[in-house]
Design a protein with these regions (language model features):
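Helix-biased detector of long, well-ordered alpha-helical tracts
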Residues: 1-227
Length: 227
């Protein structure tokens, strides 16, 4: 309860109601927490996955994949000793930082289950555009890279619980990233790619050696939710 109060205050959220449930003895291991959020639409702000436009910069608000990697190592006995912690963080302050620079932002999405890669494919399909990523620009901790390398995982498809994916006109991108670097949870924000007219509905990655490869579309079993 103390942790929830602390985080709610940090995020500027009021907890206004609550109830309890009754479960059979031995049927519950831990605490169930279910929330419903009610908020306000910001005046002058319109964002949607359908609004991505060719020429937009693709931004992430920090290094990716840490939460999914952390949960995977905690749940499975791989015998891997890696220094990885979750990226879990409240995001409203990060959104406010973005909108303090400009309200001309086309997409703001959290990259939870399925990670950044799933979000990018959803946006590419919704907006009928292509997305080209620069592999060298994608921020991934070395420990996460190491775990992914050993297990054959793609960091772009690991869940994040404290990261945003932002699509904004290219002329605003550097200013947005500079502002994010001042934030508590977005010091590793980076421009990782751009929206294109080519290959609508697809995400292409330019590798470190300059080759272009198609990011495999999402498939298979995603890491289960914790709920």
């Amino acid at each position: 309860a103390a942790a929830m109060e602390k985080t709610a205050k940090e995020a500027g959220v009021k907890i206004v109601a609550g109830d309890t449930k009754v479960a059979g003895k031995g049927q519950v291991d831990g605490v169930f927490i279910t929330t419903t959020g009610i908020g306000e639409i910001q005046e002058g702000v319109e964002t949607s996955g359908f609004m991505a436009k060719p020429g937009d910069a693709v931004i992430v608000s920090g290094d990716i994949g840490r939460h999914g990697c952390t949960i995977l190592l905690a749940r499975e006995d791989f015998g891997i000793d890696a220094d990885v912690t979750s990226d879990c963080a409240p995001l409203w302050g990060t959104v406010q930082d973005i909108l303090s620079v400009t309200k001309d932002v086309h997409v703001i999405r959290d990259a939870t289950r399925g990670g950044v890669g799933t979000v990018l494919y959803e946006i590419a399909e919704q907006s009928h555009t292509g997305i080209r990523l620069n592999a060298e620009a994608i921020p991934v901790q070395e420990s996460v890279k190491g775990v992914c390398g050993m297990l054959g995982l793609e960091p772009l498809y690991l869940a994040c619980e404290g990261r945003l994916v932002i699509f904004a006109p290219k002329e605003n991108a550097e200013a947005i990233v500079a502002k994010l670097h001042e934030g508590k949870y977005s010091t590793e924000a980076a421009i990782i790619g751009e929206v294109t007219e080519e290959m609508p509905g697809r995400v292409v990655v330019t590798t470190e050696i300059g080759a272009e490869t198609l990011l495999p579309p999402p498939g298979g079993e995603l890491l289960p939710r914790i709920c």
